Every structure is written in structure tokens, then in C-alpha cells.
Amino acid sequence: MKNKYYPLRSSMDELSAKNDNEIDLEKGPLPEYNSEDGSTLPPYSENINLKDPKQMGANNPNLFNTDESTTPPDYGEDSLSITHRENHSSGTADNSSTSPLKKAFLSFISIFVLNVPAVCYLTYKDALFKDYGKDEWVYFGVWCAICLMIFISLWYFYETWIKAVKVTVIFLAQCIKVTVVFLAQCVKVISIGLFNIRREMMIIIWLLWLIICCILFGCVKSGDLNLNKALIYSTCTISAVLLLIVSSVCIPFWTFERTLAKLAKVFLLQSGIVLVLNGTMFLRGKHFEWTGCEIEASVLFIMGNVLFLCEMECPGALIRTRNSIRNGIAFILGGIGNAMMGLANAFRGGNDNNNNIPLGEMDVEGEV
């Protein structure tokens, strides 16, 4: 018995049969298929692996389950349409147009920003709607018409100018980023250069403070400039503080903790100078034209400059001087201590010798 149709067991078989019944213009009409003896191959057998899932799984039984008791999956038009909608729903975004209200609002904001400078200028000149004549009102009407045309153009070409604004903002942001990076590199190079020439920079600072303090001293003493004494005292103290801070070349002068340590040393030095000067003046009973504060400021200023010059000429001289003074004091104190220990040992030794004399010898010495 020859059949001109295929038995339909599922929707997939129905779809396969529908495709097989179509005539291929290149291969001609479909040949007849004898399902009993199998003498004639199915139509377009080279495409059978793409048509019949069970034929595809004939060589590989694990690929499809050919058990007739199991219902094959439903590949109907509804499931295909659902799959098609799912694939397209996650692929592209919604390209719905922007609402007219949003277009109008952004266009109005643009016109408002454009008119803000003009309104501010007229308000600053006190000419906003004041003493307007015929010509001024004509200009105002023309300007309103221009703004209206610009508003309509912005509303109509909303997508175009929004894209242009976005591109411009991105370009400006990149320019700002490049400029900031360039300035940061310049600052880094300048700071490295200043650090490498820090000795020369400190000499320049010292010269500037020296000139300023000398000018202030001269003006105050000559009477040409009436300054408060606190100004000259603070100037001298600040100069000494600055010079002592930057005196150690090997230590970065921008280190906060070491700067505080230098300030503490300056205050201790200042207190020592005050005590020495006041004690000397009290012991000698002499009176100078300058007060104790003026002498203190002058000595502190001179001492700071001398120490600074010594450090500039011989880096590390202050540290070596401090160590030398400390070692000298330790040596002197050690010598004094050794001498005292020697005397103590001598007295102790004499007492021990007297206590160790035999009694017979003491009697003989007594008889003699």
C-alpha cells in the first residue's frame, strides 16, 4: 500500500510533513515514498536530520527518547511565538519616543539659562523694564520672537541637540581630566625640583627674612616708622623659628611632627636666653638702653642666622655639635665621677689598712 501522506503523531511531525510537501524548484517534485518496503528514500533525505527528530536520533539513541509511551514536547506555533517574543524582549531596549512634556521642559530650561545672563546684566544696570520707549519695546518683542523660534526648534530637534550636548559634555570632561592630570604632573615635577634645590631655596628664604628684619629694626630705631614692639619681637622669633626648622637639610621641612619638635627646641632656646640675660643684668646691676625683650629678640635672631649659616656650610654641623657637646659634658662628668670614686676608694683603703694592723706591732710602737 502506497501512502501519499505521513502519519501525524505530533505537532513537530506535522510541521515536518508540511515542509516536505513543499516542492523545491532545484530538485524537482517530491518522489513517492513506499513506507512498507522502504525502497524509496524519504524526500530530500539529505535534510532528514533537520526534519525528523526521531531520524536524527537513530544513530545516537541517547539523543532522543524514541519510546512511544513518552509524549514528545510540544513545538506548536504558540510555543514558537512565545520563544520568539522572549528572545526579542531581552535583546533590545525600548525605543519609545520621549514625552512631549519632557521635551518642552528641557527646551524651556535651555531658553531660561540663555536669558539669565541678560536679565542679571539689566538688573545690575537698573534698566530692566525701566524707562522703556518705543524702540526698547520693539527690541523686547523681537527678542521674545527669537526665543520662541529657538524654543520650537529645540522642541522639534530634541534628540539631535540632546546628543550634541552629551557629546560636548563628554568632550569637556575629557579635556578637564587631561588638564588636571597635566597640572598634577607639573606640580609633581616642580615639587621634585624644589626638593632637589632645597638648600638654595632655604638660603633665599634666609636672605629675605634677614632683609625684612633689618629693615624693621632700622625703622623702629630711627623713629621713621612707629611700629608696635610686638611686631619686631614676633618677626625676630618667626625668623628664628623658620631658620631652625629648615636648618636640618636632610630632614624635609614639611614634616609636621619634626616641625613641632623644632618649635619646641626654639621655645626652650628662647627661655634659656631670657634666663641668662635677666640673670646677667641682675648680677651686674647694669641697665641697657634696650629692654630684656629687645635683647632677647636680637640675640635669638643673630643666633638663628649663625646656626643656619653653619648648617648650610657644613650639613649636619648642628647635630655633630650637639653630639660633641653631649659627649664632652659626659666626659667631664665621667672624669669628675671617676675622681670622686678614686678619692672614696683611697679613704676606704686607708681605713682598711689601719684596721688590719696587728696588736703586737701596736704595743711595740707604743713603747717606742
UniProtKB/Swiss-Prot annotation:
One protein family per Pfam: WTF
Chaperone keyword on record: no
What residue spans carry the region label Disordered? 1-98
The cross-references to InterPro entries, in alphabetical order and at most eight, read:
WTF
Report one GO cellular component.
Answer: ascus epiplasm
Where does this protein have compositionally biased stretches of type Polar residues? 57-72, 89-98
Superkingdom to which the source organism belongs:
Eukaryota
Its keywords, alphabetically, are: Cytoplasm, Endoplasmic reticulum, Membrane, Toxin, Transmembrane, Transmembrane helix, Vacuole
Q: Biological process GO annotation list?
A: meiotic drive
Question: Is Cytoplasm found in the keyword set?
Answer: yes
Composition bias, kind Basic and acidic residues: at what positions? Answer: 11-29
Instruction: List membrane-spanning regions.
Output: 105-124, 139-158, 170-192, 202-221, 234-256, 266-283, 328-350
Q: How does it assemble?
A: Homomer. Forms protein aggregates. The two isoforms can interact with each other and with themselves. High sequence similarity is required for their interaction.
Function as written in the Swiss-Prot or TrEMBL entry: Promotes unequal transmission of alleles from the parental zygote to progeny spores by acting as poison/antidote system where the poison and antidote proteins are produced from the same locus; the poison component is trans-acting and targets all spores within an ascus whereas the antidote component is spore-specific, leading to poisoning of all progeny that do not inherit the allele.
Q: Identify its protein family.
A: Belongs to the WTF family.
Q: List the protein's name.
A: Meiotic driver wtf23
Organism equals Schizosaccharomyces pombe (strain 972 / ATCC 24843) (Fission yeast)
